[in-house]
UniProtKB/Swiss-Prot annotation:
One GO term of the biological process aspect: mitochondrial translation
Keywords, in A-Z order: Mitochondrion, Ribonucleoprotein, Ribosomal protein, Transit peptide
Residue stretch of the organelle transit peptide: 1-68
Description of how the protein assembles with itself and partners: Component of the mitochondrial large ribosomal subunit (mt-LSU). Mature yeast 74S mitochondrial ribosomes consist of a small (37S) and a large (54S) subunit. The 37S small subunit contains a 15S ribosomal RNA (15S mt-rRNA) and at least 32 different proteins. The 54S large subunit contains a 21S rRNA (21S mt-rRNA) and at least 45 different proteins.
Record has Ribosomal protein as a keyword: yes
Protein name stated in the entry: Large ribosomal subunit protein uL29m
Free-text function comment from the UniProt entry: Component of the mitochondrial ribosome (mitoribosome), a dedicated translation machinery responsible for the synthesis of mitochondrial genome-encoded proteins, including at least some of the essential transmembrane subunits of the mitochondrial respiratory chain. The mitoribosomes are attached to the mitochondrial inner membrane and translation products are cotranslationally integrated into the membrane.
UniProt organism field: Schizosaccharomyces pombe (strain 972 / ATCC 24843) (Fission yeast)
Family (UniProt): Belongs to the universal ribosomal protein uL29 family.
Keyword Repressor: no
Length: 144
């Protein structure tokens, strides 16, 4: 039976004397604009928030508060909520990649954003329902 050491020695690559290995080119980091849209996925250009900032966040908007807002305000708030959700999920993915435990505050933040988005949808549904019923009422008045 052959020894494995002998076969390993035969398979070894021999490098001739004076051979110079190629040196890889040093690449500089790409320049990224400070206003690049992908920075919206990070708060203060950091992948993870510092522990002192982690638990600081507001509450969800209530439907009563949102009823006073214009459509454009609700539209802007919806996209701010989307951006915040993307930011939170980016942080969550980074924590998973680094094998860190996801803090409870992160889940609470996502819940608050989801509640706000649900309240926005509810207020817009109420407005649509009121518009439809007013339209039907106007039709009934016009036909009688």
């Amino acid at each position: 039976m052959r020894s494995t050491l002998a076969s390993a020695q035969k398979a070894a690559v021999r490098i001739p004397k004076g051979f110079v290995f190629p040196v890889p080119k040093v690449k500089s980091a790409p320049k990224v604009s400070d206003t690049h849209p992908l920075w919206n996925f990070f708060r203060d250009k950091q992948a993870l928030p510092p522990p002192s900032e982690e638990a600081k966040f507001g509450r969800a908007w209530a439907a009563e508060e949102l009823r006073w807002k214009s459509f454009n305000d609700l539209h802007g708030l919806w996209y701010n909520c989307l951006r915040e959700k993307n930011l939170l999920f980016t942080q969550r993915a980074e924590m998973k990649r680094l094998q860190l435990t996801i803090p409870k505050a992160s889940n609470e933040r996502v819940l608050a954003v989801n509640k706000t988005m649900a309240a926005i949808k509810f207020v817009l549904w109420e407005r649509q329902r009121a518009y439809t019923s007013a339209k039907q009422l106007e039709k009934q008045k016009g036909s009688s």
